[in-house]
Amino acid sequence: MKSLHCVGLYLLSLLCQLTEAKKHCWYFEGLYPTYYICRAYEDCCGSRCCVRALSIQRLWYFWFLLMMGVLFCCGAGFFIRRRMYPPLLVDEPTFNVSYTRQPAGPPGGPQQPVMPYYSDPGGAMGNPMTPSFYVQPNSPQGNPPFPPPPSYCNTPPPPYEQVVKSYK
């Protein structure tokens, strides 16, 4: 009975070996080829050695694509960051434009101190080319006190013929 068990196991192992897919490999040793066998999930490497087919070191294209993906993501992130947060402009225009008129103070009275509004973190004092804008400190935010407009603003312009005659 024991021998029948042993023969059965031996035949089963032979059947498993026959059904298992194998790779037949060969290499030249001198002038003659030498043959050897590797398992189905292994590759032949040359001189009677077998290596696993899916070893991560042999997948050069995987590493290449991984590095290209990392570079692409870094480049895209840099581009998006530059578009969403553009760099601060250092060069200011060389001309000085006054956007508000200074209110006329009382003729004999002391002038109120004027607080400068800085257009950049360095301020107008740090950069001589930076125009400074002045705001009255004690005025409401959106309604600074200005003098009334000149009287000629309330009248219609003179006719064209009158202007031409006055210059002749």
UniProtKB/Swiss-Prot annotation:
Region Disordered: start-end pairs: 130-168
Location in the cell: Cytoplasmic vesicle membrane; Late endosome membrane; Lysosome membrane
Membrane topology recorded in Swiss-Prot or TrEMBL: Single-pass type I membrane protein; Single-pass membrane protein
Record keywords, A-Z: Cytoplasmic vesicle, Endosome, Lysosome, Membrane, Signal, Transcription, Transcription regulation, Transmembrane, Transmembrane helix
Chain intervals with Pro residues compositional bias: 142-160
GO cellular component: cytoplasmic vesicle membrane; late endosome membrane; lysosomal membrane; organelle membrane
PANTHER family given in the database record: VESICULAR, OVEREXPRESSED IN CANCER, PROSURVIVAL PROTEIN 1
Stated name of the protein: WW domain binding protein VOPP1
